UniProtKB/Swiss-Prot annotation:
A motif (DWD box 2) lies at residues 310-325. A motif (DWD box 1) lies at residues 269-284. One of its GO terms (cellular component) is Cul4-RING E3 ubiquitin ligase complex. This is Protein pleiotropic regulator PRL2. It comes from the Eukaryota. It comes from Arabidopsis thaliana. The lineage of its organism: Eukaryota, Viridiplantae, Streptophyta, Embryophyta, Tracheophyta. The DWD box is required for interaction with DDB1A. The gene is PRL2. GO terms for biological process: mRNA splicing, via spliceosome. Belongs to the WD repeat PRL1/PRL2 family.
Length: 479
């Protein structure tokens, strides 16, 4: 057979014949009607229609006997009959299998109206079917565990309103921190000063000078009478609040310092900045303990009493967990695609959120597992995030948008827009820092129009006046 195949002559084709064949093929592919749909196939249409009827009416069977009408005073129920529906041609096998897979429904009551006798040849009762629910070929079985039923419903929160505006700074207000006693709070500004304000009255109590650049980070210790500040002048300072002066300075940053955090249980202060590292300092000795590197600027840092004790967010779009015992990275989160400019820990729960221009994401601790995105997209560069114990999270953007969220579900229940002060530009409506007081009932925002705004919940609001408009998502994103 092989020899015969080899000896068979190959038919030669002329160049003209090959050219005509190529032209014919091109016309078949690129003809003007190539974008039109082909004529429907009757056999395919019939099979598709039979399948749809089986899926929709697979649990119904044509009635064999007419249903008798019961007296309206009788307590007896109507006999169980099947709904009489016409089936497709040649669907005897489908109706036979439908009898075995009928929908389970309890006995139906007869109509109350005696005048409405109906057609005695048809019945609307449904037959019970044997077998478990998983054995039935019903289209609704796949909808039993839908996404909305499993998504947590948000709690109702009263809307927040602005009740006080503080003026005094001569530049953008970039940082804020509350006193542990909740009597005063401090703000740092681009005018290189730190101002201390009374929480109850909003009166300016003190102005501290010492930085030669804008103050980007503030923190007040709950274990000592110290306040820490960091700025664009590459300096980190420790202030004695009893003497109102600088008692220590921490030198080592090569560029401006963007963020600052205090460890809750150790005498350690953490600072991150433009030199792409987070530095760990000993408060008393002023020694640099560790240098925690990133690939770009470090914009946010968090400190926790348990592992991971240090969490940093960077311009390289990553979040890193650090082991403070050895100064080594424990994990790297790469869910974000943009700069991670702000992060916040929940005061009670073991979760934290990170804010970026692409989304606001919630992670669980200690492993950093992704929980979910917030259900709305704030189309701003988010500079500030804060969370209180009641589960109200607030985010502030560079365009003046102040959004309030439910922590549990990620539902955005309020969107507020700040109003710039007279004499300021519209571009100065950005929010650069936000912080709740120790009770979580008051909120302070620092803005680009050189003002500080204080917010509180609307006491007159009720669920009736401000109803909860919540729509659960249709799917969960995995990243």
């Amino acid at each position: 057979m092989t020899m015969i195949a080899l000896n068979r002559e190959v038919e030669t084709q002329s160049l003209k014949k090959l050219s005509l064949k190529s032209v014919r093929r091109a016309r078949e592919i690129f003809s003007p009607v190539h974008g039109q749909f082909p004529q429907p196939d009757p056999e395919s249409k019939r099979i598709r229609l039979c399948h749809k009827i089986q899926v929709a009416f697979g649990g119904v069977e044509p009635a064999s006997k007419p249903t008798r009408i019961a007296d309206h005073n009788s307590e007896k129920t109507a006999p169980l009959k099947a709904l009489a529906l016409p089936g497709p041609k040649g669907s005897k096998e489908l109706r036979k299998s439908a009898t075995e897979k009928a929908l389970v429904v309890g006995p139906t009551l007869p109509p109350r109206d005696l005048n409405n006798t109906g057609n005695p040849g048809k019945s609307t009762a449904i037959l019970p079917a044997p077998g478990s629910f998983s054995e039935r070929n019903l289209s609704t079985a796949a909808l039993m565990e839908r996404m909305p039923s499993r998504w947590p419903r948000p709690e109702w929160h009263a809307p927040w309103k602005n009740y006080r505006v503080l003026q005094g700074h001569l530049g953008w207000v970039r940082s804020v921190a509350f006193d542990p006693s909740n009597e005063w709070f401090c703000t740092g500004s681009a005018d290189r000063t730190i101002k201390i304000w009374d929480v109850a009255t909003g009166v300016l109590k003190l102005t501290l000078t010492g930085h030669i650049g804008q103050v980007r980070g503030l923190a007040v210790s709950n274990r000592h009478t110290y306040m820490f500040s960091a700025g664009d002048d590459k300096q980190v300072k420790c202030w004695d609040l009893e003497q109102n002066k600088v008692i220590r300075s921490y030198h080592g940053h090569l560029h401006g310092v963007y963020c600052l955090a205090l460890h809750p249980t150790l005498d350690v202060v953490l600072t991150g900045g433009r030199d792409s590292v987070c530095r760990v300092w000993d408060i008393r000795t002023k020694m640099q303990i560790f240098v925690l590197p990133h690939d770009s600027d470090v914009f946010s840092v968090l400190a926790r009493p348990t592992d991971p004790q240090v969490i940093t967010g960077s311009h390289d779009s990553t979040i890193k967990f650090w082991d403070l015992r050895y100064g080594k990275s424990m994990a790297t989160i790469t869910n974000h695609k943009k700069t991670v400019r702000a992060m916040a820990l929940h005061p009670k729960e073991n979760d934290f959120v990170s804010a970026s221009a692409d989304n606001i994401k919630k992670f669980s601790l200690p492993k950093g597992e992704f929980c979910h995105n917030m259900l709305s997209l704030q189309r701003d560069i988010i500079n500030a995030v804060a969370v209180n114990e009641d589960g109200v999270m607030v985010t502030g953007g560079d365009k003046g948008g102040l959004w309030f969220w439910d922590w549990k579900s990620g539902h955005n229940f309020q969107r507020a827009e700040t109003i710039v002060q007279p004499g300021s530009l519209e571009s100065e409506a950005g929010i650069y820092a936000a912080c709740y007081d120790q009770t979580g009932s008051r909120l302070v925002t620092c803005e680009g129009d050189k003002t500080i705004k204080m917010w509180k919940e609307d006491e007159d609001a009720t669920p009736e006046t401000h109803p909860l408009n919540f729509k659960p998502p249709k799917e969960i994103r995995r990243f």
